[in-house]
Amino acid sequence: MALIVSKFGGTSVASPERIKNVAKRLIAMKQEGNDVVAVVSAMGKTTDELVGLAAALNDHPSKREMDMLLSTGEQVSMSLLAMAIQALGYNSISFTGWQAGITTDDVFSSAKIEDINADRIRGALDTGAIVVVAATD
């Protein structure tokens, strides 16, 4: 059994129909006997919309608050994809990067990964789940 990690950008998850298509692709990988992890970005133009909202409120928002705001786009995508997989009859769980065991430095807006503790992801895979992780690019 192989471990397959696939990254899906904003265009791939830009609409409910596209999310369903991604879910079907991931399920096909699972049906081939693989452990499957998907990493997803925010839907379509979500990041641009969030940046616009921030700009409407503050000409110079802090990098920390921008990181917090922008991470919500990925959280929406990860949850919707897990729901789509579940609707097709398969076990799925979503994680933020932090929940998945990814630790970064504290350089806001350009953090680097310092450590990955894959125990939580491995535990979910061991239950047969398709794991969906929010990207933090």
Please tell me what each predicted stretch does:
Residues 1-137:
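Nucleotide/pyrophosphate-binding catalytic subdomain
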